[in-house]
Amino acid sequence: MSKVKMISPAVPNVPWQDKPEGHTGAPVWRYSENPIIGRNPVEGVARIFNSAVMPYGDEFIGVFRGEQVNGIPYIYLGRSKDAIHWDFDKNKIQFVDEEGKPFMPIYAYDPRLVKVEDTYYIIWCQDFYGAAIGIAKTKDFKTFTRIENPFLPFNRNAVLFPRKVHGNFMMLSRPSDSGHTPFGDIFVSESPDMVFWGKHRHVMGKSSEWWESLKIGGGAAPIETSEGWLLFYHGVSGTCNGYVYSIGGAILDIDNPSIVKYRCENFLLTPEEWYE
């Protein structure tokens, strides 16, 4: 592989910490002041995690999974000047339908946040006769309009590409069952309008490597590079103490993201700290 160059626009004022002295192994490292957000920074929320963050104007904006004190997860909005110190809205995001009427999911968790052209999209897992993909759009982070049930159940881990490919929206997902499924591969689908999805293609599945021998699923939005779409994804292994989730990497073809050009043999990050 030749030297890879970024094509996706750089994130302005992104917080950065140089590689720790003596660091070896994977080419990524943890921020030394982790965790940057406490367990329950919002009243009535027992745990907040699984964030999706991006720049918005002169600040950063994020959507977060917040598990309420009754255990039901919803999506909460947060704002930050530096992506490290966060202020959260006290109330969960209020979704509406195309007519502006309330359209709230029974639950919502594991959000992703992606901007395509002039619109921001939130993608999450919701209930639609089991685990299913939820999508909403906004331009001002004040009004959040849901797109009704874009995929059949059971599906989750939806990841939207940050630009159209051949004029269509592209999305990764992981069809599965309705529980903590012990299986799952990554697929890619396309749509002309974010409503009707088709041309479903298989991207990749689990491997013989132990860290991703059970199932895999999409992570953050793909990053466009000179070699293709850089995808960070999660791989899962099963242990006698439960599932272990690690981060892997792959590069997908720029014009046909169902083609995997490169894939990491080893994980990039795996749980090591107390907060993980």
Annotate each language-model stretch with its function.
Residues 1-106, 114-214, 223-276:
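Beta-rich carbohydrate-recognition and catalytic domains
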Residues 220:
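Catalytic core of Fe(II)/2-oxoglutarate
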